[in-house]
Amino acid sequence: MGEISPRGGDFDIDYILENASSLEKISLLAGHDFWHTAPLPRFNVPSVRVSDGPNGVRGTKFFDGVRAACLPCGTGLAATWDQSLLFDAGVLIGQECLAKGAHCWLGPTVCIQRSPLGGRGFESFAEDPYATGKLAAAYIRGAQSTGVISTIKHFAANDQEHERISVNAVMSERALREVHLLPFQIAIADAAPGAVMTCYNKINGQHVSESKEMLDGLLRKEWGWKGLIMSDWFGTYSTAEALNAGLDLEMPGPTRLRGPLLELAISSRKVSRSTLDERARTVLEFVKRANKAEVSTVESTRDFPEDRRLNRKLAADSIVLLKNESGLLPLNLKALKSAALIGPNMKTAAFCGGGSASLQPYYSISPYQGIMNQLPPGVEIIYETGASSYVFIPELEASEVRTPEGQPGLRMRFYREPPSVKERRVVEETILQESSWQLMGFSNPQLDRLFYADIEAELIAPATGPFEFGLAVYGSGSLFIDDQLIIDNTTVQRGGNFFFGKGTREEKATVDLVKGQLYKIRVEFASGPSSKLMKPGVVNFGGGAGRLGMVQAIDPELAIARAVEAAKRADVTILGVGLTRDHESEGFDRSHMDLPPAVASLVTAVLDVAPDAILMTQSGTPFNMLPWADNVKTHLHAWFGGNELGNGIADVLFGVVNPSGKLPLSFPRRIEDTPTYLNFGSERGQVTYGEGIYVGYRYYEKVLRDVLYPFGHGLSYTSFAYSDFAVDTASATLNVRNSGDVAGAEVVQLYIAADATTSSIARPVKELKGFAKVTLQPGETCSVSIPFDRFTTAFWDQEAHVWTCEKGQYRVMVGSSSQNILLEGVLEIKETTTWSGL
């Protein structure tokens, strides 16, 4: 391959296909490197840059990359239920792409959350396929309005991390169509994303990246898809099969399964030259379109005031007020004398989930910071952590350590040889701002796949007492303090969830430190090929990774006791608990819904002495809130809220913003209640989608199962009245009035129910088929119209293999949640019709 081209000029696709050699055409069909397509300099075809991820644009580096805007996670964006706002969010994503020099954004994610345990559930929008498709379409339209290309992913049913590259997702044709493909179908029809990324998994026995039925038959022929189909990273598993099925682009590069293997496949007539030309044409069309984007020539930043304002609105509008029984919120700042801010999530800025969604933010605002920013002088603040909730021991930040030369941070030096070789030459050096490193995509021409690195820093102990250190690696590593071996994660390794499930467990050791004393820290690291672990079904991203953590050991009982005393003293107690990217991440699924035991005990203990405490929970997907959730009076839920998380929370707490978020997921009472309790995770390479079409609220309603908080639920500081409901063949209309004292926004949700006595097939109790968000001043009334479309009454007939709209009467319901239906009407379909395609 040649050098990566700068932005090229125009090029003639037909001319290239007529005059390029087979080797040149083949080179187009795999990435040049981790983040770029291959150029053809002879024909003025440039390289195109792609970049993750669903809630921000990381750029080309997991390791030592440029900082970026971080938006709320997918479920947080969906909680706004605001298609106009998601368009604006997409515009910001597109602008970030341009600043990072990226022509193509690898997002959004639209796989359905079958289970609360799915590691990437926070990346997707909602448990409902219709809502997911509509919200994703708005996000895509916004991003593509800037000229960049969106890549909708992961096609399809990539909803668990366990053995994700090998698991066979077995489901009915109806479940596949009505639940798992429908978000893609709606978003493609409404927004025309420029690319589709295939999933890692199999569906009904075949990897989707080599399924002719899924890629050529359904996506290209039935849906008329004209855009690019790319693999997920290292998600190409064959040469001829994938090419013939319709997979245009293998990512990342350099190629593993094209190149010489594709030459052989063409020579042996397993792949025709016409197929080669078809795939090359699609890639060239993609590059031609992408090259029109006015991207920066260098990876840069754009942390502008208007971006911060938008991100703050996204954070605030995503927050869901679950309970406000005593009317405590919004808090009256003028009457506030003292406040206890308690909990492990209070000073943690959990701005994003883990994996492809993670990035280095321009900045992050913790709930504690956000609250402090708005408190007037004179309010007494009592802060207590109360309990630890981390999975991995917290990383060392640059402010806590210095390099041997005295700079903030940790010095990382790369070598060709191991530490046993004296007088090694330093090949590359960088300064880490935190004590973790992910080296997939990292390369240096002087280093082989097996290379070595020393991470060194000086630590001045902040206190006297026991400190816990932890080291997790993909590769191998050992921790030394003052040249004494403290942790050996080289000789014997135990598999864990670190680094997309490829790495080790975090090995730990406790060391007594003396306040003010200087300690020399060194990690001797070797890259991925030195690992002793082998795991089935796990993506091999290569490179290597490591994470060093340090935390002062605390007595759990004493920490809770201090929090209880703080709650007793304060006028108002705000308790912040939940999950972080340690708990929710690409690479692994949660094994349970529970909080760490100490955190659950903390909540119970604080509520016992402060029953009016405000509970602020945070996560991307539901977690176990029993037994205390039934007793709490005031409860709001934030998500992984992006850069402005803490400011958004404070805006809602103090009434700067009237909460308008609604749950895009049902919050179950127990994991045992969920539709996938018996059918989640790979068993001998297979997972059966036994719930069929009954995902989320559809399941809970069908089996009469109570939930803690229903799909679509969310309260406001004002109230709304619905009236004058009318239904015709094209739409449903109603009036909504703000009957309260403050301005606010309401999400009107429309559900359809088939008549069970006349329907020829089992249907959900009701299905979401439309929604609209309106903002009203006190006393203001507006008319809301929600149009019907071809999906309004349709189901997939898996015998005839078509969508069917069956004649009969359908109940049309509108309400403020799936369980709070306020008005009903009737839609009559006079004759049965069938259809296919988009």
Curated annotation (Swiss-Prot):
Pathway participation: Glycan metabolism; cellulose degradation
SUPFAM superfamilies associated with the record: (Trans)glycosidases, Beta-D-glucan exohydrolase, C-terminal domain
Domain PA14: 405-564
GO CC annotation: extracellular region
Catalytic activity: Hydrolysis of terminal, non-reducing beta-D-glucosyl residues with release of beta-D-glucose
Lineage, highest ranks first: Eukaryota, Fungi, Dikarya, Ascomycota, Pezizomycotina
Recorded GO MF terms: beta-glucosidase activity
Organism: Emericella nidulans (strain FGSC A4 / ATCC 38163 / CBS 112.46 / NRRL 194 / M139)
Described purpose of this protein according to its UniProt entry: Beta-glucosidases are one of a number of cellulolytic enzymes involved in the degradation of cellulosic biomass. Catalyzes the last step releasing glucose from the inhibitory cellobiose.
Main location: secreted
Keywords assigned by UniProt, alphabetized: Carbohydrate metabolism, Cellulose degradation, Glycoprotein, Glycosidase, Hydrolase, Polysaccharide degradation, Secreted
GO-annotated biological processes: cellulose catabolic process; glucan catabolic process
Active site, renumbered: D232
This protein's name: Probable beta-glucosidase K
Subcellular localization, as worded in the UniProt entry: Secreted
